[in-house]
Regions:
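Long, ordered, helix-rich scaffold segments
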Residues: 350, 522-870
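Surface-exposed beta-strand/loop patches in extracellular or lumenal glycoproteins
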Residues: 37-58, 130-133, 139-148, 419, ...
Length: 870
């Protein structure tokens, strides 16, 4: 490695010495060599002798002019261009060359298939031209694009088209202008040949907005759902948040090569095609809902992210935590609130809690960063959203919306901080959030322990609630947090007991603010069954000694669907933990009859929402189960999970078959009622696949071949792979033959291959690196084959012989120079070595040491490896 990457610290923030108010860009486009001319209007705000330090990577400088005169007072350093002796106000003209075709990191301007496109967040604009590449520099952008008309008939950039023309040699040009000042991370450019779906949306003030969705030629029939989702997002943001769109045009472009999910560039969103393209035979129900959510997320950024942006990248959760909260609310308002909440909580418990316990632990507002791309994390996004949700819980919807309005009044058109947001919420609601602010600075997952006591003579019920946050890799000392802790108490008939104290009603959300607190309730006429941490009111781990009877009671009687699911999760957790210990001692699975009966009751409940029943019947993933243990035994977890599946499949075989048959649908609609029925039916099929082999094989094969939609086809295929049924290989081959030309559809197949429980799965994965549909230059393919193996097949990745680790080292060695961002995502399971036994730790450490010795190790990997080895 040439030099050790340097860390940046939040407390070192300084306002820039120069601001750029306007920038006029011209791109003379060519895949091999693009010429960029940047004309910036700059103003000095710092000391008179302060040089202008511009960021730039992989650029070839052609010329520099200041106020039209050639300028020689400059020097190039690694990653920077430093210009001296500048007047207070000036026009800076820089011409440079870049090569989009050579840009395999997919940051800046790069080639995706036959198109050219950009990705500038977080620090990609410096790969396009020299500039103040930081979010607190907001300029008005005008962009002129010149290109070959036959190769690139569509030339797109932010804002409205203001001019266009034809040139000789078959070239043409377009000029676009974005009237809203923005940081350069929101700049976008796309050039290519597309099919276009056009529509309009009339805002509540009567303005007509042109909507344009650009997809690869031949994919137009997969675009309508994304357009519907966009219009739903625009309407919802007006209705729920009072926020209206502000430009005359909104464009979305779907590209196949993309490091992230999607990008909210002002007026021109660039999307991974995974989150745009859907047709009933290519996309599952989950894909449809993910598209709706991600389209919503990027649209909602127009206000929370673009109109008000981040002062610096340490404040990333200001825009991302808030916008994830908004997209979760959007999905919940349009669909099932309980199912969406369950999905979010699965992510927190299975993935974010693991991040908190890893070497990369950080608060939602990090204090120290080496490579900013490494902080687009579950902590910043999902835990960030939980922190916003807690504010919403403490304030209520009305005060929260007042806080949002005040936030926009104060900060519209500027770059703000997390503190600015909390201050607006506090000022608008008169709720003191001073203690609550600690969530922004303290990392880790708090553990909340609850003990209760009931006195039948005084009819008093007491809860003693204590909290502690274990030390994390980045912080040894922890302080008590302000935890909104929601509860409900039930009597023996399933009625909710009103919470009272001293004759007054008590709010069901308890404010837990100390290391230990006691809450006493009066007039509790019966020993209650408590529902605790209702709706997952805070991102914490809960410890309470439940009896099986309490949990089965809540599964049946809790009035809140989330509480019913959560009780089932707790019941399963009890027996998973017990059986992992039994497995390690060589004993068989033990599952009491009443546990199977509790799940039978769910299947026989005619009033239950099928979508909720499906969630209750979906066992926690291996990653969720892992979080129940200090030291993770991935082999034991996989085997216990399978044994549990087989036991329930045998105990409830008749019920599973009956529910499977009764939920058959003839036609396919993306409708929440139908989605619930399909999800329940396919959850039953999953168990049936682990039952009697002949019946399983017949049912699964028949569903696969009769399916008129991808949801049912993939559910059958997935069941065949998970249960290793005789029909597996034939069905997998049929799928490959049918879809091998469609990368997105093949991603589902690659995931099934790489997460298979088969003994030879690693050998299979290695073979698939040469598959006709696989490419090491496409992030979606890499994530589906290599990422899913390392991250979602722990039993195989953590094989005793270390073969899984060695495989990942080989892949990361290739990706380190090819695409460091993707490499950095894939290394996550390897850096969590301290959660495993000594033998595995030793092998994982050796693998990390091997990577650390790579020549030209990227900053992205360096940061994670050094933290893991510390």
């Amino acid at each position: 490695m040439t030099q050790q990457p340097q860390a940046k610290y939040r407390h070192d923030y300084r306002a820039p010495d120069y601001q750029i108010t306007d920038i006029d860009l011209t791109f003379d486009l060519d895949a091999e060599k693009t010429v960029v001319t940047a004309i910036s209007q700059a103003v000095r705000h710092g000391a008179p002798d302060a040089p202008l330090r511009l960021d730039g990577e992989d650029l070839t400088l052609v010329s520099i002019h200041v106020n039209d005169a050639p300028w020689t007072a400059y020097k190039e350093e690694e990653g920077a261009l430093i210009i001296s002796d500048l007047p207070e106000r000036f026009t800076l003209r820089i011409v440079n060359e870049i090569s989009p075709a050579a840009n395999t990191a997919l940051e800046g301007l790069y080639q995706s298939g036959d198109a050219l496109c950009t990705q500038c967040e977080a620090e990609g604009f410096r790969h396009i031209t020299w500039y103040l590449d930081r979010p607190d520099v907001l300029a008005r952008f005008t962009t002129k694009i010149i290109a070959d008309k036959s190769k690139y008939p569509f030339l797109l950039s932010n804002g409205n088209r203001v001019a266009q023309g034809e040139l000789e040699n078959g070239r043409h040009w377009v000029q676009r202008q974005d009237p809203f000042p923005k940081p350069c991370y929101l700049f976008a450019l796309v050039a290519g040949d597309f099919d276009v779906l056009r529509d309009t949306f009339t805002t509540r003030s009567g303005r007509e907005v042109a909507l344009e969705l650009y997809v690869d030629r031949g994919n137009l029939d997969r675009a309508p759902w994304a357009m519907t989702s966009l219009k739903n997002s625009m309407k919802w943001d007006e209705t729920r948040f009072g926020l209206e769109y502000d430009l005359d045009i909104y464009m979305i472009v779907a590209v196949d090569f993309f490091n992230m999910g999607a990008m909210e560039n002002k007026g021109l969103n660039i999307f991974n095609s995974k989150y745009v393209l859907a047709r009933t035979d290519t996309a599952t129900d989950k894909d449809y809902l993910d598209i709706e959510r991600v389209i919503g997320h990027e649209y909602f950024h127009n206000w929370t992210g673009n109109r008000v942006t981040c002062r610096d990248w340490f404040q990333l959760s200001l825009k991302e935590g808030l916008t994830v909260f908004r997209d979760q609310e959007f999905s919940s308002d349009l669909g099932s609130r309980a199912v969406n909440r369950i999905s979010n909580v699965r992510t927190m418990r299975g993935l974010q809690f693991a991040e908190d316990a890893s070497p990369m632990a950080h608060p939602i507002r990090p204090d120290k960063v080496i490579e900013m791309n490494n902080f687009y994390t579950l902590t910043v996004y999902e835990k960030g959203a939980e922190v916003i949700r807690m504010i919403h819980t403490l304030l209520g919807e009305e005060n929260f919306q007042k806080g949002m309005q005040l936030y926009f009044e104060r900060h519209d058109g500027s770059a703000a901080t997390c503190d600015d947001f909390v201050q607006a919420m506090e000022d608008a609601s008169n709720v003191d959030l001073s203690h609550f602010r600690r969530w922004y600075s303290q990392s880790g997952t708090p553990i909340v322990t609850v003990k209760d006591d009931y006195n039948p003579e005084t009819e008093q019920y007491t809860l003693t609630i204590s909290q502690r946050t274990p030390a994390t890799a980045d912080q040894a000392e922890k302080q008590p947090l302000h935890i909104p802790f929601a509860i409900e108490l039930y009597d023996n008939e399933g009625n909710v007991i009103p919470l009272q104290k001293g004759g007054h009603p008590v709010n069901a959300v308890l404010n837990v603010t100390q290391a230990e607190q006691t809450f006493t309730f009066d007039n509790v006429y019966f020993q209650p069954v408590p529902a605790l941490l209702c709706e997952f009111s805070a991102p914490v781990k809960l410890e309470y000694k439940w009896s099986d009877q309490q949990l089965t009671f809540l599964m049946r009687h809790a009035r809140n669907d989330f509480s019913r699911w959560d009780a089932a999760q707790s019941l399963l957790a009890t027996y998973i933990k017990l059986n992992v210990a039994r497995h390690q001692q060589g004993q068989p699975l033990s599952l009491p009859v009443h546990v199977a009966d509790a799940f039978r009751a769910v299947l026989l409940d005619e009033k239950i929402d099928p979508a909720l029943a499906a969630e209750i019947l979906t066992l926690p993933s291996a990653n969720e189960i892992a979080e129940l243990f200090e030291v993770i035994d991935p082999i034991a977890i996989a085997q216990v999970r399978e044994a549990l599946t087989r036991t329930l499949a045998a105990e409830l075989a008749d019920e599973f078959l009956a529910i499977y048959n009764v939920n058959h649908l003839d036609e396919y609609r993306v409708d929440h009622g139908d989605i619930g029925k399909r999800t329940l039916r396919n959850a039953c099929l999953r168990f049936l696949a682990f039952g009697e082999t002949e019946l399983a094989n017949t049912l699964v094969s028949k569903q696969y071949r009769d399916a008129n939609n991808m949801t049912d086809a993939l559910a059958a295929l997935s069941a065949a792979v998970a249960a290793q049924l005789p029909c597996r290989d034939t069905l997998m081959q049929e799928y490959d033959d049918k879809w091998h030309q469609d990368g997105l559809v093949m991603d589902k197949w690659f995931i099934l291959q790489s997460t298979s429980p088969a003994e030879n799965v690693l050998e299979t994965v290695r073979g698939l690196l040469k598959h006709r549909s696989f490419s090491m230059s496409n992030p979606n393919r890499i994530r589906s084959l290599i990422g899913a193996f390392a991250g979602s097949n722990p039993a195989a990745f953590h094989a005793q012989d270390g073969s899984g680790y060695q495989f990942l080292v080989e892949m990361l060695t290739d990706l380190n120079s090819r695409n460091p961002q993707v490499a950095s995502r894939l290394i996550e399971p390897l850096i969590r070595l301290k959660r495993y036994d000594d033998k595995r730790q030793e092998k994982m450490r050796a693998a990390l040491e091997q990577l650390k010795g790579l020549e030209n190790l990227s900053g992205d990997l360096y940061e994670k490896i050094t933290k893991a080895l510390a």
